[in-house]
Amino acid sequence: MSEDWVRDINGMHRYYGVNEKVQDFDADKLKQFLRFRMTFLDEELTETKNAVNANDAEEIVDGLIDLCVVAIGTLDSMGIDSYEAWNRVLRANLQKQVGVKPERPNPLDLPDLIKPAGWKAPSHANNHGLLTKLKK
């Protein structure tokens, strides 16, 4: 256990043999795996929303962490470099500016990040891992 979630999840996957199994999937099985993981995320999000509605602090924390575990675990099992993906997204997000996005109400008056003119979305080129097995 550490403060490096990506490394911890990778270690857990190695311990249980998850990545070795997923690496052998053909495109159809890989697509099935991705659908399974997206359903898993939906279930965790629903549980977390229910915890918020119930003011259940314990389950809110657990649910938020579970969402991170499933999302990071999916990247890991797909052979995607999560550190690189994170850095690319963070770099792009830090180019955004505080402003007002009219189509997104902000009743809490928190700083809202908007894309300035010329903003470029992050590219994950060369970091698609096993997703390259899928055809568009």
Language-model-derived ranges and their functions:
Residues M1-L64, C68-K136:
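Flexible "arm" and connector segments at domain edges
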